[in-house]
A protein has these predicted regions:
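Generic anion/oxyanion-binding catalytic loop in active/binding sites
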Residues: 1, 22, 102
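A short, structured beta-strand-centered segment in the mid-to-C-terminal lobe
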Residues: 1-9
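C-terminal cap/loop subdomain of S1 sulfatases and analogous C-terminal strand-loop tails that border
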Residues: 10-13, 18-86, 90, 95, ...
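Active-site-proximal N-terminal segment of extracellular/periplasmic enzymes that hydrolyze or transfer
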Residues: 95, 100-105
């Protein structure tokens, strides 16, 4: 099935459980994307991407730790320990050839996407019940 809906790898387990007719466990972070495959929903407005590289490359002094938020219009990536990042307008530049990070015209967009990224990171936590005893 071809769809333009955005989904994340954290949605896989929720989708498998949904297909099997099982309820997701308490605290699962993903959401089933089966309705998006049927065209019944758009699923997510944005996705969060974490990339932790195994070693330094591409001119970086250390292994890349990258956090990205992507929606239909923008891709915004920050690199740990670096004073630069990446900002691409995916509607005007779908091949991501023009990095807008240092362009002052887009400073408001950088601020907005930074806030979205911080909010997403802030709400990442395991909400499953804690164990009653030590293992």
């Amino acid at each position: 099935v071809l769809t333009e809906a955005m989904a994340s790898t954290i949605d896989l387990s929720a989708s498998i459980l949904d297909r099997a007719g099982l309820e997701p466990f308490n605290g699962i972070q993903g959401r089933s994307f089966l309705n998006a495959l049927d065209g019944k929903s758009s699923h997510r407005d944005e996705v969060f991407i974490e990339h932790n590289d195994g070693g330094p490359r591409m001119g970086l002094k250390q292994a890349a730790r990258v956090r990205t938020i992507r929606n239909k219009k923008w891709r915004f990536s920050v690199f740990a320990g670096e004073n630069w990042g990446e900002l691409y307008d995916l509607e005007d530049d779908p091949k991501e050839t023009k990095n807008l990070w240092h362009d002052p015209i887009y400073s408001h967009q950088k601020a907005y996407l930074s806030l979205q990224l911080v909010e997403y990171l802030t709400f990442q936590m395991d909400e499953s019940p804690r164990a009653m005893r030590l293992a």
